[in-house]
From Swiss-Prot:
It comes from the Archaea. Part of the 50S ribosomal subunit. Contacts the 5S and 23S rRNAs. It comes from Methanocella arvoryzae (strain DSM 22066 / NBRC 105507 / MRE50). GO terms for molecular function: 5S rRNA binding; structural constituent of ribosome. This is one of the proteins that bind and probably mediate the attachment of the 5S RNA into the large ribosomal subunit, where it forms part of the central protuberance. This is Large ribosomal subunit protein uL18. HAMAP family: Ribosomal_uL18_A (MF_01337_A). Belongs to the universal ribosomal protein uL18 family. One of its GO terms (biological process) is translation. One of its GO terms (cellular component) is cytosolic large ribosomal subunit. InterPro entries: Rbsml_uL18_euk.
Length: 188
């Protein structure tokens, strides 16, 4: 670590690689709620946050684990389909909480078009949440529905069979779960 009279120690969360304060400041200055999308090794997490002086306040939250518990989703909780459905769910929950618009906060993730973060963003936009974005970054509809998994018969998709779902049936199952979410939240 550098020393000397001119050395300034970075904030702890910056040193730990958890927060980009320049990006966070830009998001906070906008004074809009943030759509925070994070992906872990097993699920996708989406939250609507507002910044307060005492700390961020969560207005709505959704996880891909919630899809399995509430809507009977049998697919993987970390794939593109689950990210889209989680985004759709957070969009509807945000509207119930009175949030009509938000800005995307993807944290320290690399900005890559077609990623799961953008699949969640597409779900939120499809639910009616206003988020400024370009259509070019969204994954294709075939990828969101899981057509790429259904067309692949590789043995790496055995987790689906353990959950009682054949990989070839994922697009139909996706449409079924999307219909359940839309009927529960979208018809209001």
């Amino acid at each position: 670590m550098a020393t000397g009279p001119r050395y300034k120690v970075a904030f702890r969360r910056r040193r730990e690689g958890k927060t980009d304060y320049h990006q966070r400041l830009k998001l906070i200055v906008s004074r809009k709620p943030r759509l925070v999308v994070r992906r872990t090794s097993s699920q996708v997490i989406a939250q609507i946050l507002v910044t307060r002086p005492e700390g961020d306040k969560v207005l709505a939250a959704a996880t891909s684990a919630e899809l399995a518990k509430t809507f009977g989703y049998k697919g993987s909780g970390k794939n593109t389909s689950a990210a889209y459905l989680t985004g759709l769910l957070i969009g509807y929950k945000a509207q119930e909480a009175g949030v009509e618009e938000a800005i995307l906060d993807m944290g320290l993730r690399e900005n890559r078009a077609g990623s799961r973060v953008y699949a969640a963003l597409k779900g939120a936009v499809d639910s009616g949440l206003e988020v400024p974005c370009s259509e070019d970054v969204f994954p294709s509809d075939d990828r969101i529905r899981g057509e790429h998994i259904a067309g692949n018969t590789a043995s790496k998709y055995t987790q689906y069979e353990k959950n009682g779902l054949k990989a070839a049936d994922l697009p139909a199952h996706f449409d079924e779960v999307k219909g359940k979410i839309t009927s529960q939240y979208g018809a209001k």
